[in-house]
Design a protein with these regions (language model features):
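A residue-level marker of the well-folded mature domains of exported/periplasmic proteins
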Residues: 1-168
């Protein structure tokens, strides 16, 4: 358990619609850990890339050697954090978002420090977009402008269900 642990957030702030989703992920994480004994000791912008995630994580673990976990708003930056931590021989757990094929491959390794990725089904997202577009093209108003697409965790307990798929 990671109770009373130091954590780090790898985020991607900005004003594009994609970044709005990233900001929501970060805020959801912060809301969830509030009052539960976690101390966010660092937050950094990895620009959603493996390269930046790796470089900055290397610097962060030097300055904060007691970090126990990194939450990354996407798997690309999470994979960079994973690479830096693996190279440094640090057992710091990484949690990402997207269900990226690369992340799933390392989650599948025995005792991987990349513990989990949260995912949504791109197929479901595509179907919901199609339904909304079809409604708009027909000149009708959609019932809802926001559609909730459920997220789910991919970790060592269910990785076999998702490992062979590029995306869910």
């Amino acid at each position: 358990a990671l109770i009373s642990s130091s954590v780090c957030i790898c985020h991607d702030p900005g004003s594009s619609p994609a970044n709005n989703a990233c900001n929501d992920r970060e805020q959801g994480f912060l809301d969830t850990i509030e009052g539960k004994g976690f101390d966010v000791v660092a937050t950094f912008d990895a620009e959603g890339t493996v390269e930046k995630g790796q470089t900055i994580t290397s610097d962060i673990i030097q300055a904060n050697p007691d970090i126990k976990a990194i939450f990354s708003i996407n798997d690309q930056a999470g994979m960079g954090a994973y690479a830096a931590l693996t190279t440094a021989g640090k057992e710091v757990y990484v949690y990402g978002v997207d269900g990226a094929p690369e992340a799933k491959k390392v989650i599948a390794k025995d005792n991987s420090i990349y513990r989990m990725t949260a995912a949504q089904s791109p197929i479901t997202i595509g179907k919901e977009c199609y339904k909304a577009a079809k409604t708009l093209i027909a000149g009708e108003k959609p019932e809802e402008f926001e559609v909730d697409v459920p997220a789910f965790a991919i970790d060592s307990s269910n990785i076999d269900e998702y490992l062979d798929a590029d995306w869910q």
